[in-house]
């Protein structure tokens, strides 16, 4: 019985498998319109329009709104600021850590 099924399948391709597989790109049936012809007619009027120069003199901006009042004009001594903060105890925190897996082994 299996010999008959093999004979029938030798010359027949599965229609669902036609679009599948490597090496076959899907066919694109869309018609491409040439944008060069259409845009050349419209762009003629656009090319004649001159751009107006920007007149941005920064007169409207108040620098008090831009620069914070706490740091404006101050000289910061970073060495002194570091001493005032004190020592970081980050190294000590690592020594106190106990892994939960170690507790389970006991």
Curated annotation (Swiss-Prot):
Region (Disordered): 1-106
Superkingdom to which the source organism belongs: Eukaryota
Disulfide linkage: none
Compositional bias segments (type: Acidic residues): 29-62, 85-106
Biased composition (Basic and acidic residues): 17-27
Keyword Chaperone belongs to the record: yes
InterPro entries: Histone_chaperone_domain_CHZ
The keyword Kinase belongs to this UniProt entry's keyword annotation: no
Keywords (A to Z) from UniProt: Chaperone, Nucleus
Cellular compartments annotated: Nucleus
Any Pfam family matching the protein: CHZ
A GO cellular-component term linked to this record: nucleus
Biased composition range(s): Polar residues: 1-11
Assembly and oligomerization: Forms a heterotrimer with H2A.Z-H2B, stabilizing the association of the histone dimer. Also, with a lower affinity, forms a heterotrimer with H2A-H2B.
Annotated function: Forms a chaperone-bound H2A.Z-H2B complex that acts as a source for SWR1 complex-dependent H2A to H2A.Z histone replacement in chromatin.
Family (UniProt): Belongs to the CHZ1 family.
Name under which the protein is recorded: Histone H2A.Z-specific chaperone CHZ1
Organism of this sequence: Phaeosphaeria nodorum (strain SN15 / ATCC MYA-4574 / FGSC 10173)
């Amino acid at each position: 019985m299996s010999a008959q099924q093999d004979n029938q399948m030798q010359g027949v391709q599965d229609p669902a498998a036609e679009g599948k597989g490597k090496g076959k790109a899907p066919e694109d049936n869309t018609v491409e319109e040439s944008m060069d012809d259409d845009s050349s007619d419209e762009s003629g009027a656009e090319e004649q329009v001159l751009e107006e120069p920007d007149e941005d003199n920064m007169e409207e901006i108040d620098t008090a709104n831009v620069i914070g009042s706490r740091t404006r004009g101050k000289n910061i001594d970073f060495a002194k600021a570091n001493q005032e903060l004190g020592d970081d105890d980050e190294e000590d925190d690592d020594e106190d850590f106990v892994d939960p897996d170690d507790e389970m082994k006991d």
